[in-house]
């Protein structure tokens, strides 16, 4: 394994951590409606759990309402039940074969709780990135120990890994600021 492989592997894993963090952020509800909010909700389709997006058409009716139109008429009550029982605190209403999912306004207290959740998720993502940095540095030390690279090369590669870590941590911080602004906007 070369220094370039270690660096590239660390970068790919750090990017995956960022992607997972973005996915977690998308599940945190803001005052505005977006179809991604329902992505992780599963409903029962012929005995197997599937995401709602695979059995229904998701659209934005307005800034605070998501429209869910199941492709099969008999799926309407199943999808509605799945949305109602999700951990998002949503109260869907059916009109014919369209389920309207209004986004309730967030209270100030709830907004503050959500910002704490965002910060907690961010800290988890930062820890994951730092752990990946540690793993990469350990691999570099092993290369020095096995006399495959010099200590100077290890130091240079370690600096590169640190720059990667700083870049990804800064990206996490930027995502947090954006999400907090989104949550606190009334």
Curated annotation (Swiss-Prot):
Share an example GO biological-process annotation for this protein: cytoplasmic translational termination
Write out the GO MF terms.
Answer: ribosomal large subunit binding
UniProt keywords, alphabetically? Cytoplasm, Protein biosynthesis
- One cellular-component annotation, GO: cytosol
| InterPro entries for this protein | Ribosome_recyc_fac (IPR002661), Ribosome_recyc_fac_dom (IPR023584), RRF_sf (IPR036191)
Where is it predominantly found? cytoplasm
- Subcellular localization: Cytoplasm
The protein's job, in short, is: Responsible for the release of ribosomes from messenger RNA at the termination of protein biosynthesis. May increase the efficiency of translation by recycling ribosomes from one round of translation to another.
- Write down the NCBIfam families for this protein, in alphabetical order: frr
Q: Which family does it belong to?
A: Belongs to the RRF family.
Q: What is this protein called?
A: Ribosome-recycling factor
- Phylogenetic classification of the source organism: Bacteria, Pseudomonadati, Pseudomonadota, Betaproteobacteria, Burkholderiales
């Amino acid at each position: 394994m070369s220094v370039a492989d270690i660096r590239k592997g660390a970068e790919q894993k750090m990017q995956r951590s960022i992607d997972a963090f973005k996915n977690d952020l998308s599940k945190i509800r803001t005052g505005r409606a977006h179809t991604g909010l329902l992505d992780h909700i599963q409903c029962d389709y012929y005995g197997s759990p599937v995401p709602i997006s695979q059995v229904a058409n998701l659209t934005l009716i307005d800034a605070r309402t998501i429209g869910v139109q199941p492709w099969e008429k008999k799926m309407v009550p199943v999808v509605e039940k799945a949305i109602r029982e999700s951990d998002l605190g949503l109260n869907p209403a059916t009109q014919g074969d369209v389920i309207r999912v209004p986004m309730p306004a967030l209270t100030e207290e709830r907004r503050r709780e959500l910002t704490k959740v965002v910060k907690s998720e961010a800290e988890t993502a930062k820890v994951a990135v730092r752990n990946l940095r540690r793993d990469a540095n350990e691999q570099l030390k092993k290369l020095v120990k096995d006399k495959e690279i010099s200590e100077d090369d290890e130091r240079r590669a370690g600096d590169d890994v640190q720059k990667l870590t700083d870049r990804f941590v800064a990206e996490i911080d930027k995502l947090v600021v954006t999400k907090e602004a989104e949550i606190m906007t009334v």
